[in-house]
Every structure is written in structure tokens, then in C-alpha cells.
Regions:
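Generic structural motif
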Residues: 21, 55, 77-86
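Acidic, low-complexity mobile loops and tails
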Residues: 1-60, 100, 105-115, 122-127, ...
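Short, conserved beta-turn/loop elements at beta-strand boundaries and strand-helix junctions
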Residues: 26-29, 86-94, 118
């Protein structure tokens, strides 16, 4: 059976966490976090997303919520330390957005970074993330 080829985007204006295939956008006083198209490709179609409650203090690498896929429930790991200020209610009620529009309407949470300068150093730019994607998925078709 032929292996499915990854096809997805890697926007240039985001930062990426290679450990968890998550993206981060610095949005003024807050950060916005979501799953990358590669992370979604590996997890499988997301059929439910639930974020931790507003005000939750999330440490780097700890769960910011969960996603339910066809055969499993997975923790969504935070790419940095933050205080959760808003979950994307639209994505929680319509998780298909996470699959089809992960970088705009399908974002997962917003928050206030707790250690931005330190945590930022562990994130990579789009060029480095593209190299990571091609190392993991050599036949990837990146938009």
C-alpha cells in the first residue's frame, strides 16, 4: 500500500515548535497557538478539540487541551509557557476548522506568554521548520 504524502502549508510569519508540531504567532501582548498541518497529518483527522479553561497556567510541554481523532485522544502540548486567555470556541464547536484552516480560523488558544524571551529561543522560523518537515517527510509537498 502506498504511503500518503504530506501536503501542507508553512506560513512564513509564524514561529514553530519542532517537538510538538505546533505554531506560535506573537500578537502584541498575547500569543496565538495552533497545530501545524504536519501535526494534523500525523494525528489524523481531528473530530473534537477541547482547550483547558480560561486562566489556566500552562507550562512549556504540558497539555493546553486535547484533540480527539478517529482512533485516539491526544494531549495538545504547549510550545511555551503561558496563561490561557481565550480558547477558540469556533474551533471547539467546529473542529473541522483545525483540519482545514489550521493557521487562521483553526487556531486553538490565545494567551499571555510567561517567559517569552526564554521560550522564544526554542522556537524556529519557517525555513527551519521546512527543513524539519522534509527530514520527517522527504516527499512532502509544501505550499
Amino acid at each position: 500500500m502506498a504511503r500518503e504524502v504530506f501536503r501542507g502549508a508553512i506560513p512564513n510569519d509564524l514561529l514553530y515548535d519542532i517537538r510538538y508540531d505546533m505554531w506560535v504567532r506573537n500578537d502584541g501582548d498575547e500569543i496565538v497557538i495552533g497545530a501545524t498541518s504536519l501535526g494534523i497529518f500525523h494525528a489524523g483527522e481531528i473530530i473534537a478539540f477541547t482547550a483547558k479553561p480560561r486562566g489556566a497556567v500552562i507550562d512549556d510541554g504540558r497539555g493546553l487541551g486535547t484533540v480527539e481523532c478517529a482512533k485516539t485522544i491526544l494531549a495538545v502540548h504547549a510550545p511555551l509557557s503561558f496563561v490561557l486567555t481565550q480558547a477558540n470556541e469556533e474551533a471547539e464547536s467546529n473542529p473541522a476548522l483545525v483540519n482545514t484552516d489550521p493557521y487562521t480560523r483553526g487556531w486553538m488558544v490565545r494567551g499571555r506568554a510567561r517567559n517569552w524571551n526564554e521560550d522564544r529561543a526554542a522556537l524556529v522560523d519557517a525555513a527551519a521548520y521546512r527543513r524539519h518537515v522534509l527530514a520527517v517527510e522527504p516527499d512532502a509537498q509544501i505550499e
